[in-house]
């Protein structure tokens, strides 16, 4: 009994010494420096400081709008709508998934738009980086290839619609049309073209559905859903004709 009490006291004393040692080491250790961040509004003696601040703010705004610009001013809209039509026509519900469709549409957009982005890099960004042109000139040269691409894919009817809605004077040429007027007209034209391609994609799959439904009715199998039977045949047909290659090549070639 006496040995048990002594062992308990020894354990308690050892724990107290350990706690005191850790506390002493913690006090002796140098405190970690904490970073400080000061945000304030002060007077500036140079007008250029204000200009740089505005430029940074505009740059952050453009970066936050990058997904919207990708959708509005590139081939992304047509591609993602056509791929969605393809999935619906096949009847595969969630295969391929939305993530796969968006990723494929994004990289196809990079592939299609790469000549335009290379032109922007060579004619606008690199000269501006080398301080050969001003920032305003660089912006004008960067917008020009994008405007040319959008105008080449926009119907005159859609363009005339938004020019009339904006109540602007009749433009003499394409350079007189504001970019904010071209963008919605371009998107409407892209949706129209995507729906036309989607209609062509639907036709062979509808034929397969009709044939399967007719066969089931002739066999008296009224209660069996035709979609469940036709799905394997539609997938087989799509694979045999190299459907992915045909759809992707048609999409890329549709942009000329």
Predicted regions and their residues:
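N-terminal secretory/membrane targeting signals
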Residues: 1-29
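Hydrophobic alpha-helical segments and their helix-loop boundaries in membrane
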Residues: 2-4, 29-256
